[in-house]
């Protein structure tokens, strides 16, 4: 797989990636840095633009989408990216989404023309994945089942773009990489690249602290019924568990004190990053800012200080 753009690709596809690293202000007496990779500045508003572009590119190059719709399960962001990038390339998209996905995410899917299949909210993305598999099994000639949780193009997206960008932007000074984990593609691809460049780098995965949580898109890997096939548990040096309450509080703090409006999963990742610099005053921590808090404005009660 190759991340380089092809001549046939829509101009919108070429706008994905090369997002900035934004500093989070810390105590000036410390030498540590926390740098937020602003993935919400991708054209579709999330890190999943990289994943969707890579999967679409791979499928188109292999002829998988000739006369077929792209089908996948998503908590919202990958589905939005498929729909947006698919619209630019003339690819029709069907997305299975848990019914508790935020109204903003569901609205964006419809605006971009995706067919949306809502699944049981209590079953989360596991249930959405099961429904997508069922749909594909019933009409395999109509759909290409992308299956982002097992598609190698997911990892390739980050190995070929996110990782090299971070390495270049930090001039190799990065000491810790932090990413929230759902499909785990961001950690596997970016972390794998960075580990090859700098074997002593610390890779920190972030997951909810409970199977019942409010962090859309993330998995509690120990209890999920469908562990991502992409996940290599030997790659992260540690996995930090963050509660929904701490993630929410951190996202609110970022909005009010830095102007960075990020979603709940990014709040969880930043909380884990801040824990690192409390213990390691010389660390250079890069954390993935997965998406924008604008995707969750309907959860206004979570944004209000309690």
Task: Describe each PLM feature range.
Residues 1-306:
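PLP-dependent amino-acid enzyme catalytic core
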């Amino acid at each position: 797989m190759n991340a380089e753009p092809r001549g046939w690709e829509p101009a919108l596809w070429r706008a994905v990636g090369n997002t900035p690293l934004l500093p989070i202000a810390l105590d000036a007496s410390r030498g540590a840095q926390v740098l937020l990779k602003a993935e919400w500045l991708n054209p579709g508003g999330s890190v999943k633009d990289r994943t969707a572009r890579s999967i679409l590119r791979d499928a188109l190059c292999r002829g998988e989408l000739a006369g077929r719709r792209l089908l996948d399960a998503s908590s919202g962001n990958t589905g939005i990216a498929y729909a947006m990038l698919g619209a630019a390339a003339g690819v029709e998209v069907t997305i299975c989404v848990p019914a508790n996905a935020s109204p903003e995410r569901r609205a964006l899917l419809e605006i971009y023309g995706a067919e949306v299949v809502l699944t049981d909210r209590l079953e989360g993305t596991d249930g959405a994945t099961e429904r997508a598999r069922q749909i594909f099994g019933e009409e395999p000639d109509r759909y290409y089942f992308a299956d982002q949780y097992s598609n190698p193009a997911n990892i390739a997206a980050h190995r070929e773009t996110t990782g090299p960008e971070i390495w270049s932007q930090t001039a190799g000074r990065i000491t810790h990489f932090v990413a929230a984990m759902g499909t785990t593609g961001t950690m596997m691809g970016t972390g794998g690249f960075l580990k090859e460049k700098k074997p002593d780098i610390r890779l920190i995965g972030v997951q909810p602290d409970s199977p019942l949580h409010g962090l859309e898109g993330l998995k509690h890997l120990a209890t999920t019924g469908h562990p991502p096939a992409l996940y290599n548990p030997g790659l992260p040096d540690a996995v930090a568990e963050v509660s929904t309450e701490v993630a929410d509080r951190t996202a609110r703090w970022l909005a009010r004190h830095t102007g960075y409006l990020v979603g709940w999963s990014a709040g969880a990742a930043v909380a884990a990053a801040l824990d690192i610099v409390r213990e390691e005053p010389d660390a250079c921590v890069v954390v993935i800012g997965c998406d924008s808090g604008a995707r969750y404005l309907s959860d206004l009660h979570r944004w209000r200080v309690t």
